[in-house]
Amino acid sequence: MIAAIQFGLLFGVIHYLRPQNKVKPSLYWIYSLAVNALTLTMFGVGVLRIDNFALPEFSFSISNTLFITAALLQALFCRLLVKPLSRSIKVASAILVVFVFISIEYLRHHGTFEQRTLLMVVCISSLLVWQLLEQAQVRKRIESPQLIFLMYATYLELAFLCGRLAIVLTKTNVIRDIPEIPALLVFFTVGQIVMNTISYIAIGGFWAEKVAVANAITSKENIEIKSLLS
């Protein structure tokens, strides 16, 4: 259901990319939203088809890597609001994605559910901290209620991730099947995904603000031109 909400948001903002619009959403955010929605769908289908919890299908490695990719793209979007992306950041981002894929694939064969979760939580938490640092820089230059909303959503998503981390680190027995996953871990995971969705909504609102301002300026200019010609 959350994936459906994200796909709906994606289809709702695509019209901002029309050529006649002077202000267009960042493609990094669009790609992040698309990748995240696709990944949630893949996870949902994968969970329904899973046969061996100890050795999940290869698609789970792809899905986990895409989750990190979506968080990375959102972090790059926040960075782009502050300054252009340097070549070193782009190269480091590509290296991170490759590293995550190799690590997740290795843990799929030789690791546990807890180890895979730990890797994901640490990577996404690090990217969220980066996002918050960039968002703080943006707020110094741009006054926007949606940016404040985005920061709150990011803080809450990070809090849910910390909850997941605490549960995984304090759990003594190894989880070997889906029914063994603690209900509290499921709660924190769902909470994180919900906050992530809210952050996408906040960014969508931010772009809607920018488009509205640009349209208002254009309308004012058109009126001034007409008054000069009349």
Regions found by a protein language model. Give the residues of each.
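Hydrophobic transmembrane alpha-helical segments in integral membrane proteins
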Residues: M1-F7
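Cytosolic signal-transmission helices at domain junctions
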Residues: E209-L228
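Short alpha-helical H-box segment flanking the phosphoacceptor histidine in two-component systems
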Residues: G204, L228-L229
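Juxtamembrane segments at transmembrane-helix boundaries
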Residues: F7-L27, A37-E180, V186, N196-T197, ...
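General nucleic-acid-binding
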Residues: T189
